[in-house]
Amino acid sequence: MRPTGGRGAHRGVWQFGYMTTDPVHRSVRLERIENSRYTAINERGGKISIGTGDGTDFTPVELLLVSIGGCTAVDVDLLTSRRAEPDSFEIVVAADKARDTTGNQLTDLLVTFRITFPDGEQGDKARERLPDAVRKSHDRLCTVSRAVELGTPIATRIE
């Protein structure tokens, strides 16, 4: 079933049951490879293996952490590398997986930035810009972090 009208209506080509040309619409699909193993495929053909953590495949929780880290990495890199290219750039995203009477959840989510810049005036400018870039990514720019923090509703549909 294809969405019609309202927020689900887009102009373009249908792929994976959704439009692909709308610049604000995003879609991925998952294909089952075997019991508890899947391949996620984006609209551009990129693939990621997903599993339960028994092998090297990413778990869904790890992919959420990757999404948060990747989103903020792009923001912070764009805002700071205008001043100077980093000497090193690493972001670590960690959380505790908890279970209570309401179900599974993540707690104590922490994003740690380990970024260094070269010595000199341009590196100094990038270092000075870093705290503001991190704040802007967290407060406004990172769609993934904002969706998690704001509690974006998730609808489901069976076709």
Report the location of each language-model feature:
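Compositionally biased, low-complexity flexible segments
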Residues: M1-R11
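Extended beta-strand/beta-hairpin segments
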Residues: G12-V66, V76-E159
